[in-house]
Amino acid sequence: MFSRRTFLSLVAGSIAAPEFASAQPSSQKVALYANVGADLTHYDVDVAGAELTKRETVALPAAVQYAWPHASRRYLYVASSSSAPGYGTAGTEHHVTAIRIDPETGALTPHGAPIRLPTRPIHISTDIPSEYILVAFNNPSSVRVYRVNKDFTPGEEVSQPGSIDAGIFAHQVRVTPDNRLAILVTRGNEGTPTKEEDPGALKVFNYKNGVLTNEVSIAPNGGKEFGPRHLDFHPTKPWMYVSIETQNKMYMFRMEPSRINPEIAYRAETLAEPNNIRARQAAGTVHVHPNGRFVYGQIAPRPPSSFRASRSSRAVKTASSCTRLTNRPASRHRSSTPRPRRSTRAPFTSTRAGTCWSRSTIYR
């Protein structure tokens, strides 16, 4: 059984960065990159035939945690760590590695030397022009920024002018499409019978040339019952979608010039029966389709793990038309994609269409 961090997939880049999978001629080659532990493997994707063909494998210094493509789509930046997930046993090997993508074949080759990180990275991304790499760490919660060298290798850390409040349990860091704000998603922790809830927040910074300043915290209700995990942006509208892990919600915030409006514009349930939770369920990754018409969210870890696809339009964004893909066989890991095999019949192997969750609607 693979854990969420042991197995991670980038399906033609569309999961890690939606803009990576913009509309392309059907004749263009499509590549899939997936990892098990420290091994990152390239697969050719036959879209018409729904087949995968295994190609080369690149070994990272430790288990892959996350990966993000350079804006040129010629390189991947891969965060790896030997630490256990969450607050588990701490390891000693934490890195960012650059990997070159052959523009003709999609083949992967290591590019330069990895850089060391202080602790386990939970998420990695770049700013819009990929001049800087942003890394989120969960234990302790923090965010750091590293330069991208002229040869596209990861470089030195950028010194920040002041202290940063990184909240509790950072889960993701992203730069807004205009490259003017950086957002650190901090989930907090659920309360227990013996411990009070740790509040969650969206930590919003002014961003310029790798420097984070003027931090503002968005924390409805003081961060209580607000456990954000992951966010994504609409490709053409000033809308930001945030999955709220601990409350199983999907929120939408409006982006304004130089700020995120702190008011929750719209919200939706991610569960069909939010008042009848039979096992711990948690809203996970969220991604907006490149055409802006669909928002995809993951619910985990109740077996089997599931996807939810919410349909949106310019005027009304509704989840009434959706598809659920269910991993098979059931497992308790949070991985979004089962392990591919050579010539498997579909980019997502061992999946089946299931019935849609009950209707929920988000209005513009």
Language-model-derived ranges and their functions:
Residues 288-326, 338-347, 359:
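Loop/turn-rich, solvent-exposed surfaces of beta-rich toroidal or solenoidal domains
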Residues 1-15:
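N-terminal secretory signal peptides and thylakoid transit peptides that target proteins
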Residues 61-72, 117-129, 163-181, 222-239, ...:
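Beta-rich, blade/repeat-based domains predominating
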Residues 44-49, 100-106, 147-154, 206-211, ...:
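Short loop/turn segments immediately following beta-strands, especially the blade-tip
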Residues 109-174:
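Asp-box/WD-like beta-propeller blade repeats and closely related beta-sheet repeat scaffolds
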Residues 53-58, 110-114, 158-163, 214-221, ...:
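A short beta-strand motif characteristic of beta-propeller blades
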